[in-house]
Amino acid sequence: MTDAKRQAALDYHAKPIPGKLSVELTKPTATARDLALAYSPGVAEPVREIARDPENAYLYTGKGNLVAVISDGSAILGLGNLGPLASKPVMEGKGVLFKRFAGINSIDVEVDAESPQAFIDTVARIADSWGGINLEDIKAPECFEIERALVEQCNIPVFHDDQHGTAIVTAAGMLNALDIAGKSLESARIVCLGAGAAAIACMKLLVACGARSENLVMLDRKGVIHSGREDLNQYKAMFAIDTDKRTLADAIEGADVFVGLSGPGLMTEEHIRRMADNPVVFACTNPDPEIHPDLARETRPDVIMATGRSDYPNQVNNVLGFPFIFRGALDVRATRINEDMKVAAVHALKDLAREPVPQAVLEAYDKDAMSFGRDYIIPTPIDVRLLERVSSAVAQAAVDSGVARRPYPAHYPLKTVDDVYG
């Protein structure tokens, strides 16, 4: 980042008021009567009602539209383990996106815990304060155990966006890309470079969407994850296959799909040349992908390419998913975000990309036209229809799969965030 851009980022966060979020009042407070209702003695009445039935917290407090964004700061963006407090700007930023795109209030919680179990214990004890929990920037493999334990212990949705948000958007784009390439997920040969939280979640969700595990090769820093390796943790071991392939060059031969969640420049011209016709390449490392889009297209003009960057077509951006997934989950008071809800989000995103693009989106991107094809396989983050389509699909899937505590909302579909409260 240039000095000018660095200073602009610092100024944005510091001026005119430090931080990006604030608390606003939702009730009148102008008179003595207002204050008596807001606090003592009036506040005693909702206290009694919640003590009588904890579900009344959704009626008398902001719990139902409140998500906690929680981190230990062990894997902050691409910066690494910088500690809980340093993660606060990122957690506030996540809150901005929740509010901007789905009308969800949030609070950021940075936990200084000496172990994964200490983190789990801390969060579990206070989880009932919120309608949902978004885990963020927690390193692998600890993030898997933390999420699993909290899902089991909490009766509200717990969602590690670094895993599942990336997976949902990737799967949606992948289904569309393969369709354009004249291929199917069920028969596609997939190579995944990377075996961290996002990579493992992506491959698990692709399998849930129809990919065959025997057609999937995953690589970590030591090469292909195969059944002969004895250094695999339980999460990598799920993807160990019986093969004589050992390197990316071996694995990529004839592959239909490459998913990169690893590091910059790790895919070469020779690698992409070895892929099958109409190769699908998702090079998602930011800011520099596994292979630069210009180089990929120069080497393989038939490539269908996606990256994590906003300055190239087909950006894999988690903001396409998490605000609307939580919106749908909160509005039916789901106890968890399960596989059915994730798959529903995948198909909602996939289908939306096939519809005509609104004029407002074209103007925002200074385009005369955008339509479903090689350069448009995923919707754009500013498409207002995301709120309607993804939230509705997730809410319906929660109801259908039995994790909703309320019926499908009568005020759905949502057209804008102003419709959130019906």
Curated annotation (Swiss-Prot):
The keyword Magnesium applies. The active site is at Y39, K94. It catalyses: (S)-malate + NADP(+) = pyruvate + CO2 + NADPH; oxaloacetate + H(+) = pyruvate + CO2. The record marks K236 as: Confers specificity for NADP. Keywords: Magnesium, Manganese, Metal-binding, NADP, Oxidoreductase. Its cofactor is Mg(2+); Mn(2+). A divalent metal cation binds at E136, D137, D162. Its EC number is 1.1.1.40. The record marks D162 as: Important for activity. Substrate binds at K94, N318. NADP(+) binds at A195, G196, A197, A198, N286, N318. Divalent metal cations. Prefers magnesium or manganese. InterPro entries: Aminoacid_DH-like_N_sf, Malate_Decarboxylase, Malic_enzyme_CS, Malic_N_dom, Malic_N_dom_sf, Malic_NAD-bd, Malic_NAD-bd_bact_type, Malic_OxRdtase. GO terms for molecular function: malate dehydrogenase (decarboxylating) (NADP+) activity; metal ion binding; NAD binding; oxaloacetate decarboxylase activity. Induction: Up-regulated by salt. Belongs to the malic enzymes family. This is NADP-dependent malic enzyme. It comes from Halomonas elongata (strain ATCC 33173 / DSM 2581 / NBRC 15536 / NCIMB 2198 / 1H9).
